[in-house]
Amino acid sequence: MKYLKPFFLVTDIGFIIYWIVTFFNLIPKSWAFKDYDNSIIIAWNWSFFPLDILISITGLSSLYLYNKNREVWKTFALISLILTFCSGLQAIAFWVYSNDYDITWWIMNLYLMIYPLFFLKMFIKRDKDETSESFRGAKTI
């Protein structure tokens, strides 16, 4: 959790700030991605809102649960990491299909795709070790 906590805080609080800024139309046109005024693109962008907020809820909840020494924090963290990867992947895939290569938005979404991979590996390894251990103790028929 030592290394994961800063990523969760930056990402989860970042999402909350992004959606507040987006709701109040505070993003300058020069910073916005291509076709930001297009109603279809606006709908596409807002389609991420439930996913991004769920990422923030699960990520921040995992930090809270970790501080309360509740083992379930790992489940919340894993869900948050998977959803974060998916959020970044969806945006990158859309921009590839629409041939849009704005480096600023790509960097932010590649961050969302890449950072979870380092931590997912630790969760998967941990689960794999636990599964192997439970199979060793199982009786065969």
Model-predicted regions and their roles:
Residues 57-78:
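Juxtamembrane helix-break-helix junctions at the cytosolic face
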Residues 112-133:
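Membrane-water interface at the C-terminal end of transmembrane alpha helices
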